[in-house]
Amino acid sequence: MKTPTKYFIIFILLAALAVFVSEATSKVGQQTTTTTQQVKCSGLQCTLNKLIVAVGKFTIKQILVGIVIVLATIALHQQYVITQKKGSLPGPSFVPPFFGMLFQLIFTPFSFYEKQEKYGPISWTSIMNKFVLFVTDAEINRQVFKEENAKLYLSLGAKKILTEKAIPFIEGAPHRQLRKQLLPLFTIRALSSYLPIQESIVDEHIAMWIKNGKADINARNNCRDLNMAISTGVFVGNNTPESVRDDIAKNFFVMNEGFLCLPIDLPGTTLRKAINARVRLVEIFTDIIAKSRKRMGDGEKPQSLIDLWVEHFLNCPEEERDELSNDTIIFTLLSFMFASQDALTSSLVWTVQLMAEHPDILAKVRAEQASLRPNNEKLDLDTMRQATYTRMVVSEILRFRPPAVMVPHENIEDIVIGDNVHVPKGTMILPSIWSAHFQEGGYSDPYKFDPQRFDSVRKEDVTCAKNSLVFGAGPHFCIGKELAKNQIEVFLTKLAMSTEWTHNKTPGGDEIIFGPTIFPKDGCNITIKARN
């Protein structure tokens, strides 16, 4: 809030207070005088005594009128500020004071999106008294992702939970240096080493689903647990005791709750519990890293992402080594878990539902896998790369149901986007990944689930590359893109070849609910059994 704005609000509030104090004191004049004569006091003390007596004489009506005046003043000022900021940009004709369009965004998100899209590629709105730009055009979205002065905006409590050591809060040269350190963790060799872990955990969980398949299985709940098991397995290795991996999962879920709560850091609050869970995760990872440093120093074979990172560090020539502190590893892992847990869970759930709704596409996946692995051989990267149709299905799942439909940014300086649109400092910018994926003039027939769009004839992965924003763009482009796509492909492959499942629809269950990521409203209930 700029200084003149502060003075304006203070002036109005003081004026309102003066009016009511004056009126109240006039009614109790003699009584107040008598009271102050009986009690000797200093000037300040007498003033306070008068004020206390005056306030005590307010009627309920006066108090209510005062509250109305204050709220009306704030609301009018909010409208004035928004009018100044929006300029000639299109947007809603009226925005409710204080909360803005928050409730529309929460309770009727599709209606909110549709209205904003009709305003054009860039439109304005207001959420919780925050001036917001809603961007639907793919090219302008890319510009926002790449803009150095537009920073990721996670949540009000995110920095308290993850701390400024986490990847989303690192910028400039330190961020580039960290990404350079991370590259060896996503090479072909690294991805190949993670694959057996991913496959074994998927097999284990699908077997449990089949065992419990006589009753409805909720895909969202089960995919959440599966995805967390894979994350902990890849990051710390299956050689880490199961009790430790369970402790990581338990504390992560508590920490994750803190990103959507009120930013009140007091004992017993959700935010404080989230911070305490992060502290516990730091302790767990510190112990795991110490053991990894010893094993890799002894020349043992890497069994996890942490092992690979430590091994690469130890094998670098000393003059090329960057410092590899425990904090660097730990807060990078926490960033990975934060970024991937809900997003990948969303993609796995949509895999289950979309394949149940498109049996013809599922049949083609099965036919391709049967030709590549006739004896149900273990997966390897070479075979997975040959499964072109399966990979097209994965790409279409991510296009058709992008896990995060928008990625909020906040600009730390005045910037210009699109067709010379000036964005004042402190504006929240919402680049809509959903809108980019369904933009007219982008993907052909975008509302149709059609993996064939990515084949060698249509090549929409090339011709519509600008519209694909599921992994972001710019300095924070998802470095784990291939690991994430592999995880979905492994899940799709194993689910398709080892099970038969039916989607048990519920009234309204197919509606999409919006949070940080999207899910079907009922979480997708299925009945599942082993496939002959």
Curated annotation (Swiss-Prot):
- Its membrane topology: Single-pass membrane protein
Coiled coil feature spans: none
Residues holding heme = C478
InterPro entries according to UniProt = Cyt_P450, Cyt_P450_CS, Cyt_P450_E_grp-I, Cyt_P450_sf
Compartments in which it is found: Membrane
Entry's Gene Ontology cellular component terms? membrane
So which domain of life are we looking at?
Answer: Eukaryota
- Is the keyword Oxidoreductase assigned to this protein? yes
Q: Which UniProt keywords apply?
A: Heme, Iron, Membrane, Metal-binding, Monooxygenase, Oxidoreductase, Transmembrane, Transmembrane helix
Q: What parts of the sequence cross the membrane?
A: 8-28
Write one Gene Ontology MF term: oxidoreductase activity, acting on paired donors, with incorporation or reduction of molecular oxygen
Q: What is its EC number?
A: 1.14.-.-
Q: Which cofactor does it need?
A: heme
The family classification in the record reads: Belongs to the cytochrome P450 family.
Extract the PANTHER family matched here: C-22 STEROL DESATURASE ERG5, CYTOCHROME P450 26
> What name appears for this protein in its UniProt entry?
Probable cytochrome P450 524A1
Native species of this protein?
Answer: Dictyostelium discoideum (Social amoeba)
Q: What gene does the UniProt entry assign to this protein? A: cyp524A1
